[in-house]
Structure formats: structure tokens, C-alpha cells
Design a protein with these regions (language model features):
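Second-shell residues forming the walls of enzyme active-site clefts
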Residues: 1-116, 122-126
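Mid-to-C-terminal alpha-helical segments outside catalytic/metal-binding sites
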Residues: 119-144
Length: 144
């Protein structure tokens, strides 16, 4: 597999192969509080080269998005920056279910794009509130 620091990593495993191997730790009821999603594509699962970080379907395979804090890997990695602007990556990550977006290539561009997406209805305020509530919940729970 490629290194997502320099290119998009791709797995050609099927959903069943992933569920029976790589995803086994996520299937166990371990009380997982947070998970970092990497920039890996699984075209045999979702039919495209969309990185897991930007795919609601792939994120759903590894987490209970309602209770698990979903964190992106760095959005400044080449796996993202070669194909997406900072704004596109930020919007798609939020739409996919990510709660914390790490290190976009340009924070002002990512912020402005998300703000515009909320203002034009592409992202609902309720969606951002959901992430905000999860972050606050875990900050309280762990006294951070």
C-alpha cells in the first residue's frame, strides 16, 4: 500500500475481507471513545477512490458515529491535497461524519468553506452541533 503522506493508499479488499480481518478490532464492543480515520481508499467496497476520511460508508464500518469521536488524519497529507482543496476536504470530512479535522493545508480556506457550506445549507448547523456535543462530552468525561 502507498504512504498517504505522499499518495492515496488503496486497498482492494472486499467488504467481507475487511470485516474478517482489518476491522475485527472495531467490531468488538470495547467502549471505543475515538478513532482516527486514515486516507485509504477501498474501491471494492464503495466503488470509488474516495479516501476513508471523506467517506460516510467507510467511516460507518469502523464506528458508531453517534457515540464515537471521529478524527481525521492530517488533511495536509498529499493523499488529500493532491485531489482536494482544503475547503473541499473539510466539507467532505464533516459530511462523512468526522468530528475533528486535523491540520488542513490552509486553515483559513477550510474555515471559510465550512462557514459558507453552513450558510448555504450544504452542512446543517445540527451536524456541527452533533460534533460539538461529542467533543464537549469527552472533554468533560476525561477532564480535559
Amino acid at each position: 500500500a502507498e504512504d498517504s503522506h505522499t499518495d492515496l493508499a488503496v486497498t482492494y479488499k472486499t467488504r467481507e475481507e475487511l470485516e474478517n480481518c482489518v476491522l475485527l478490532p472495531f467490531a468488538a464492543d470495547t467502549g471505543l471513545h475515538a478513532v482516527m480515520v486514515g486516507h485509504i481508499a477501498a474501491p471494492n467496497v464503495i466503488g470509488s477512490d474516495t479516501p476513508a476520511t471523506l467517506s460516510a460508508e467507510l467511516i460507518a464500518m469502523i464506528s458508531d458515529a453517534e457515540n464515537t469521536l471521529i478524527v481525521t488524519d492530517s488533511l495536509s497529507m498529499d493523499a488529500i491535497t493532491k485531489a482536494y482543496t482544503p475547503g473541499e476536504a473539510a466539507i467532505q470530512a464533516i459530511q462523512a461524519g468526522c468530528d475533528v479535522l486535523l491540520m488542513p493545508n490552509s486553515l483559513p480556506e477550510a474555515y471559510d468553506a465550512v462557514l459558507a457550506a453552513v450558510q448555504n445549507g450544504t452542512i446543517s448547523e445540527a451536524r456541527l452541533d452533533q460534533s460539538d456535543n461529542k467533543i464537549l462530552h469527552y472533554k468533560q468525561q476525561f477532564a480535559v
